[in-house]
UniProtKB/Swiss-Prot annotation:
The lineage of its organism: Bacteria, Pseudomonadati, Pseudomonadota, Gammaproteobacteria, Thiotrichales. It comes from Francisella tularensis subsp. tularensis (strain SCHU S4 / Schu 4). Coiled coil: none annotated. GO terms for molecular function: nucleic acid binding; protein-glutamine N-methyltransferase activity. Gene3D superfamilies: Vaccinia Virus protein VP39. This is Ribosomal protein uL3 glutamine methyltransferase. HAMAP family: L3_methyltr_PrmB. It comes from the Bacteria.
Amino acid sequence: MYSQQKQQDIINNLHTIRDYIRWSISEMTANNVYFGHGSESIWDEAVHLVLSAINVAHDIDSNMVGSRLLTEEKKIIIDYVYQRACLRKPLPYILKKAWFAGMEFDIDERVIIPRSPIAELIRNEFSPWINDIDDVTSVLDLCTGSGCIGIACSNVFEDANITLVDISDDALAVANHNIKKHQLSDRVRAIKSDLFDNLHGQKFDLIVSNPPYVDKQDLDTMPHEYHYEPKLALEAGDDGLDLAKRIILEADKYMTENGVLIVEVGNSQYALMEMCPDIPFTWLSFADGGDGVLLLTYDELVKYKDAFKKYFQK
């Protein structure tokens, strides 16, 4: 933490919301913080930090930024800025909350911070890839982490049963907490499984997965902020495709005949395309940014199964 003298100097000299936003920006700039866990700019990060610290809605009137802060509010902001700027802890871990597809999730360092572009797909109700959302009665979220993808899908597929899967007991504890938070225990369940191992022949209309996909080289060079996240949720072998390859090979056995598989592989997209040059992957595009998300239908998985086996065994 900052020294007692520095804290007192800050408290004595900075008084308004505006003051603390400006100071937050200065501290983050001085410490070369990285933004990749929700905010897109240093301004957005500073505003989010300060307003969250004092429990004020982010759509406040611009006149309110001149409001004076209580000493206790200043102390909370100072603590948050120290963690974010000096320790370079991602802001969602400081706040213990993250937003995904318009929903709030409780998170901590046991799970990766929700930030997948799949959120846009969920908000758009999977259009144009799923024609009738009422036809989807079962959804599987593989490598669920906080449960954000599967739980957000519950808003789209209101009558579907949703299964969340993770191999991590810690992640499942967080996912179960979020299921209860959103009062979805009647149709969303979380189970421990190494991908499909404990699903015992169940069939799903939609499988969505944001598995670990960071290759070893990228993991070693990632900004400090990412090293707060569980390594299990990031690392996926030399090419970043250890889990994605298993999912692609096994998914058809757990899908209905009209089923759809969506998998995020991030930058490992290029390794996968090079590995499988003859496979016509559908790569989804996102208006809000993001790439490396593939879509395969049940029919495509069956049609190219032998080719996948050949490519993945090289």
